[in-house]
From Swiss-Prot:
Taxon lineage: Bacteria, Bacillati, Bacillota, Bacilli, Bacillales
Domain of life: Bacteria
HAMAP family, alphabetized: CinA_B
Organism this protein belongs to: Bacillus subtilis (strain 168)
The protein, known as: Putative competence-damage inducible protein
Pfam families the UniProt entry points to: CinA, CinA_KH, MoCF_biosynth
NCBIfam families recorded: cinA_nterm (TIGR00200), molyb_syn (TIGR00177), PncC_domain (TIGR00199), PRK00549.1 (NF001813)
InterPro entries: CinA (IPR050101), CinA-like_C (IPR036653), CinA_C (IPR008136), CinA_KH (IPR041424), Competence-induced_CinA (IPR008135), MoaB/Mog-like_dom_sf (IPR036425), MoaB/Mog_dom (IPR001453)
Family (UniProt): Belongs to the CinA family.
Record gene name: cinA
Length: 416
């Protein structure tokens, strides 16, 4: 049969309806299916109730020919997705030997006792293509029944994502009769808004065919996912590189890395490569910048130390900010930011000193509204200060400040 093109995703789990977790699986699956030309028209969420799940399945069957389920494949009594679908299709559940062996091996390896309920996880709908689970116990499956496909996937994203990418997607492409190689890369940008990036690349995005270009903004950053497909993998790579070059020619000044990297990871790499050390004086960020830097192994090679300087006493007595500066300009000022950066650099003997002073909110301070911040940098005997007006929550402003700190030092290192 021709592979269906009208897909629906059904997320199963009462925790979704209670707002305890977000349905990130549907977003992920939709993106993955779009890359291979399968259109998702509906997202549905339903609780752990077999009767309501049956109702949702009947509705989906009236409007979709490819139904994907996530969740409800576990060993507990409320994990009923598999049983409900098998009952709806009139198919028995059978034991999958490979899955059962994998579960047994896991319990032997961890020296735990396997309960009878765990056997349930190795059951699959008869006649299904089984999707191996290398990061959990319950296998997934793809079942064809009366001109429709039903795909069952585990709920935990740490299991669902690798299963879909490594097992489900290749199987779907095979069912579709495609020998095309699909390759994606993500370009990461900071310091430019999504609307401005899209405006700068409007003609490229409007004309996209192969590769496709998917913008996404989150946490003050913008990413572009480029996805190309071709029977020849080298040609796929060429298509990606060609489009990437055109994009970076226009907005390359805001580009900082690929795929799953981050600003702080790129900063750590750059500092280690150049033998540069950093120190930080943090007021409104409250040590967040220092925490991020020390989250990575080998941080002692690049991070000399940090001071959380919330009070003016610490700014003066530890970091050497002049009393006259605080009296005349206040703690939230470019003058204070400059002296803080210089002071922490001198205190630690680092190559670069960075300071963060401002108002994280929710209340105004010294006549400054929340989000009004200054970031100072001291390096090579010079100080520079950058002023920003951020919007958002207290946590969001702190994160935005710490990210801009990484961004500014990266730009400084590019000049070296």
């Amino acid at each position: 049969m021709e592979f269906p093109k009208k897909a629906e995703i059904i997320a199963v789990g009462s925790e979704l309806l209670l707002g305890q977790i977000a349905n990130t699986n549907a977003q992920f699956i939709s993106k993955q299916l779009a890359e291979i030309g399968v259109n998702v028209f509906y997202h549905t969420a339903v609780g752990d109730n077999p009767e309501r799940l049956k109702q949702v399945i009947r509705i989906a069957e009236e409007r979709s020919d490819f139904i994907i389920f996530s969740g409800g494949l576990g060993p507990t009594k409320d994990d009923l997705t598999k049983e409900t679908i098998a009952n709806t299709l009139g198919r028995p559940l059978v034991l999958n030997d490979e899955a059962f062996q994998s579960i047994e091996d896991y319990f032997k390896r961890t020296k735990r006792t396997m309960s009878p309920n765990n056997r349930k996880q190795a059951l699959v709908i008869e006649g299904s293509d089984v999707l191996a689970n290398h990061f959990g116990m319950a296998p997934g499956m793809l079942t064809e029944h009366e001109s429709r496909y039903y795909m069952l996937l585990p709920g935990p994203p740490s299991e669902l994502r690798p299963m879909f990418e490594n097992e489900a997607k290749p199987l779907l492409l095979k069912k579709m009769g495609s020998n095309e190689k699909i390759v994606s890369t993500v370009l990461r940008f900071f310091g430019i808004g999504e609307s401005q990036l899209e405006a700068d690349l409007e003609d490229i995005i409007d004309a996209q065919t192969n590769p496709t270009i998917a913008p996404l903004a989150a946490d003050g950053e913008v990413t572009l996912r480029l996805t190309a497909k071709h029977a020849d993998e080298k040609e796929t790579e060429r298509l990606l590189k060609e489009t990437e070059a055109v994009i970076l020619e226009r907005v390359g000044e805001f580009f900082y890395g690929y795929d799953d990297t981050s600003l702080v990871k790129e900063l750590s790499i750059a500092c280690k490569e150049k033998g540069i050390t950093i120190s930080a004086a943090e007021s409104f960020t409250g040590g967040l910048f220092s925490e991020w830097l020390t989250d990575h192994s080998g941080a002692s090679k690049l991070f000399a130390g940090g001071v959380v300087c919330y009070t003016n006493d610490v700014k003066q007595n530890v970091l050497g900010v002049k009393k006259e500066t605080l009296d005349r300009f206040g703690a939230v000022s470019k003058e204070c930011a400059s002296e803080l950066a210089k002071g922490v650099q001198k205190l630690t003997g680092s190559d670069i000193g960075i300071s963060f002073t401002g108002v994280a909110g929710p209340d105004a301070q010294e006549g400054h509204e929340p989000g009004h911040v200054f970031i100072g940098i001291s390096a090579n005997g010079k100080e520079e200060v950058h002023e920003f007006h951020f919007a958002g929550s207290r946590t969001g402003i702190r994160k935005r400040g710490a990210k801009y700190g990484c961004h500014l030092i990266l730009k400084l290192l590019e000049q070296k």
